Amino acid sequence: MAYRKLGRTSSQRKAMLRDLTTDLLINESIVTTEARAKEIRKTVEKMITLGKRGDLHARRQAAAYVRNEIASENYDEATDKYTSTTALQKLFSEIAPRYAERNGGYTRILKTEPRRGDAAPMAIIELV
């Protein structure tokens, strides 16, 4: 299987890809290097496909990869409580239904200007 090493050990690379995948699911658009964007595209596409399946096994597989981070927090004045939505809940309730009729190609990579400082090629990766 071909993949990019991204100048890191396998555990560091896996952690970074999990973080970037979770950030993309929460924010729906992130700025990163071109190589990282191309690499996380694979995992994000797999997570959205799991979200479209929607069964318990798919939810557990996605939960094993996506970080348990809060995606949004809303205040309900009637009950005087905060309700929060995690990245996993957002994946299954908001993102996956949006792509129900689409077979793959859930992300878009737009190349931008090189990063100032080391001239690394940068890109914006976003959900279509």
UniProtKB/Swiss-Prot annotation:
PROSITE patterns: RIBOSOMAL_L17. Keywords: Ribonucleoprotein, Ribosomal protein. SUPFAM superfamilies: Prokaryotic ribosomal protein L17. Pfam families: Ribosomal_L17. GO terms for cellular component: cytosolic large ribosomal subunit. The keyword Ribonucleoprotein applies. One of its GO terms (molecular function) is structural constituent of ribosome. GO terms for biological process: translation. HAMAP family: Ribosomal_bL17 (MF_01368). Part of the 50S ribosomal subunit. Contacts protein L32. Belongs to the bacterial ribosomal protein bL17 family. This is Large ribosomal subunit protein bL17. It comes from Streptococcus equi subsp. zooepidemicus (strain MGCS10565).
